[in-house]
Amino acid sequence: MASLKDVKIKIAGVRKTKQITKAMNMVASAKLRGAQIKIEHFRPYAEKFQDVISNLATRSDETVHKLLEKRTNGTSCIFILITSDRGLCGIFNTMLIIKALELAKQKTTKGKKVSFICIGRKGRDAIKKTHYPILSDYSDKFTRDYQLASHISEKVIDGYLTVNMDEVVLIYGQFINAMRQIVGFSTLLPIHPKPLDKEQLEKYSEYIYEPGVAILLSELLPKFVTTQIYRGFLDTDASENAARMTAMDNATRNCDELIGNLTRLYNKTRQASITSELIDIVSGAEALK
């Protein structure tokens, strides 16, 4: 049985850990509120932007812009993987990495060459351990703002237009609510406009586009790609903080449980020590008779 001193040291250590996890939970909770506001305000804009692109695309064919053309004979594809730079957020990064590698394997089995653009240290470190090349790494010191999204957008669009590329896939953490985050993934290029329902088609039918649909698409499609990447940044940021808040809350609860178990062990050990001393005293008294 452990000594009283050892048990007390363990209890003190767990209490210090609890203080850390509780503080991290509070920090993650505060960051989540800000991140949640950002993504909830940005989503309506991104969705309306997609409606505009879909409306323009229905009034033209794929050949009007190369970013709309479906390709089947491409030899390569790029995966944009957005993860966190830091850990202690449960299985959040793991599920993103697993999904990315799963999708990459599907492409390689079809004879496609897969390469990665990594945003986030956790994703970068995981991909480094595989045979997939990393084209660009935006981890640690990079601020995930609209400017970075625009830079990445220009890079992948240039690659898509100049290289025999099949598609560009975006993988990110999709924020549902504080308790639920899932893996979000979508084909970034070629752009697949979502089908419009009858009501939407009638709504946009009387629109007159100047200077023309083709010119508008050439201006808006690159911005649409940037918007989708930036939305991935915001979604992942909110998901990361929500996952960390939940993980630290669970860790704090586990600390409470462990402190309870160790306290019971301490009391049991102390009682055993007292009983042993009483037995020694009684035995000594009996021996003196």
Swiss-Prot record:
It is found in: Cell membrane. One of its GO terms (cellular component) is proton-transporting ATP synthase complex. GO terms for biological process: proton motive force-driven plasma membrane ATP synthesis. Gene3D superfamilies: 3.40.1380.10, ATP synthase, gamma subunit, helix hairpin domain. PANTHER family: ATP SYNTHASE GAMMA CHAIN, ATP SYNTHASE SUBUNIT GAMMA, MITOCHONDRIAL. HAMAP family: ATP_synth_gamma_bact. Belongs to the ATPase gamma chain family. This is ATP synthase gamma chain. The lineage of its organism: Bacteria, Pseudomonadati, Thermodesulfobacteriota, Desulfovibrionia, Desulfovibrionales.
